[in-house]
Regions:
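Amphipathic, well-ordered alpha-helical segments in soluble domains
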Residues: 61-65, 101, 131
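N-terminal interaction modules that seed assembly of large macromolecular complexes
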Residues: 52-95
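Long C-terminal interaction segments enriched in charged/acidic composition
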Residues: 1-56, 115, 120-216
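Amphipathic alpha-helical coiled-coil segments
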Residues: 91-111
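Amphipathic alpha-helical interaction segments
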Residues: 83-86, 100-103, 107, 123, ...
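Secondary-structure edge/capping motif, primarily at the C-terminal ends of alpha-helices
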Residues: 69-73, 112, 116, 142
Length: 216
């Protein structure tokens, strides 16, 4: 059987030679790895595109709600103002979650593409799986279909991690992985906060305008 080298071959050879295993056994580790990683990246790319569409829709909704709130203030319609403001706040929360998910998934894609061997995969995948699970819990509140879609990604990543750890002889440190996952999410959230400030109207302007109208 002819064996085709891949970018994973260096780590595979070193692990298998250390265990005195024969070269043909390398095939079972290399055959399925690349297409499985590509499948995960394809799923992640689909999610990023989906997040983009949701964000565009939310931005349009936000602008419409903001204009309606301004009108309700001018008309002194307090009931309408309270209802619209509540809808706007809910929409902003969803926007933050979706923006966070988009930024994180883009970072995860970049990290996964930089993996050069099985050891890299274990180090990179360990926190990624934790991140995806955290995002899944947040997203299902706003996009229920994300539960199944992100569940599939988690399963694919988990299977790759198990195989990569076995070949590389690594033991996954879940405590460290979870800490790294939270750092990644926290850093992404800081970016989201700035983007929200830049791209959306300031809600404090509404409070000022509403107060002024009540004083008239």
């Amino acid at each position: 059987m002819q064996y085709t080298k891949s970018k994973w071959i260096k780590s595979e050879e070193s692990i298998l030679e250390a265990n005195n295993e024969s070269r043909p056994n390398l095939t079972k580790y290399s055959i399925s790895l690349k297409p499985r990683i590509e499948a995960v990246l394809k799923q992640m790319d689909f999610q990023v595109s989906k997040f983009d569409k949701i964000l565009n829709s939310l931005k349009s909704k936000d602008n419409e709600l903001f204009r309606s709130i301004i009108s309700s203030i001018k008309e002194n319609n307090t009931h309408c103002y309270d209802k619209l403001l509540s809808d706007l706040l809910k929409s902003r929360k969803e926007c933050k979650v979706v923006s966070l998910s988009k930024i994180v998934f883009e970072k995860l894609e970049t990290k996964l593409k930089t993996a050069s061997d099985f050891g890299d995969l274990v180090i990179i995948l360990s926190p990624i799986i934790s991140v995806v699970k955290n995002l899944r819990a947040l997203l299902i509140l706003y996009t229920p279909e994300s539960e199944q879609e992100l569940g599939l990604i988690s399963e694919l990543l988990g299977a790759i991690l198990v195989d990569a750890a076995q070949v590389a002889g690594y033991t996954v440190n879940f405590k460290t992985a979870n800490e790294e996952a939270m750092r990644l999410i926290d850093n992404a959230y800081l970016i989201v906060r700035e983007k929200i400030k830049e791209e959306f109207s300031d809600l404090s302007d509404l409070s000022v305008l509403h107060s002024q109208r009540h004083l008239v």
